[in-house]
């Protein structure tokens, strides 16, 4: 798999399979790679090793972590699993697709965002609770892996009491872009 990624310089499974130039059909190579990826059980140790490397490039006492929700619109797709109705942020229309939560920490120089959390989810998945639950899972992962002193920055989608309570309970530093209807007492 790693050889295929390096040789093909792409992350699409079909391109990785093509770059391997195996004697079997492309479909069989893709099926094997897909099956092996699905059976991969070392995600947690791999992620911890990656986060250890990331931490070498940040200053814990003032690092900025950017947390953002987004969507993947798939309006023409009918066969993808767990498609649900989403609001396409680029058009404002309701369509089929997936939601995402992503977090990146800025490197010490501030020039490079280093991804530290990423999840694609759908309301149609088994076990789905809510978008707030998925967001809190992201925040918990960040709390486990980064200092309270890191500044979490979030857009107005996070302007809800659940998130304020979360950060205040843990004494974590945060900046949330407020919605227009947020009342602030000074």
Can you say where each PLM-predicted feature lies in the sequence?
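An internal, acidic/charged active-site-proximal segment
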Residues: 119-186
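A general structural motif
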Residues: 60-62, 98, 111-113, 147-149, ...
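Active-site-proximal, Lys/Arg-enriched surface segment
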Residues: 2, 30-109
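Short, basic interhelical loop/turn and adjoining N-cap
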Residues: 19-32
């Amino acid at each position: 798999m790693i050889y295929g990624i390096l040789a093909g310089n792409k992350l699409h499974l079909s391109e990785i399979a093509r770059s391997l130039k195996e004697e079997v059909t492309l479909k069989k190579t893709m099926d094997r790679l897909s099956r092996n990826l699905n059976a991969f059980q070392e995600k947690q140790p791999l992620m911890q090793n990656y986060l250890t490397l990331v931490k070498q490039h940040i200053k814990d006492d003032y690092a900025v972590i950017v947390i953002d929700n987004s969507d993947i619109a798939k309006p023409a797709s009918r066969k993808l699993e767990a498609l649900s109705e989403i609001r396409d942020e680029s058009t404002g229309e309701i369509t089929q697709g997936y939601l995402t939560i992503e977090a990146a920490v800025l490197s010490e120089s501030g020039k490079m965002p280093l991804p530290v959390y990423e999840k694609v989810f759908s309301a149609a998945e088994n076990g789905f609770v809510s978008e707030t639950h998925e967001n809190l899972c992201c925040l918990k992962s960040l709390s486990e892996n980064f200092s309270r002193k890191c500044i979490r920055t979030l857009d107005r989608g996070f302007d809800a009491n659940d998130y304020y309570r979360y950060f205040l309970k843990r004494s974590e530093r945060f900046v949330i872009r407020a919605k227009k209807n947020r009342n602030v007492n000074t």
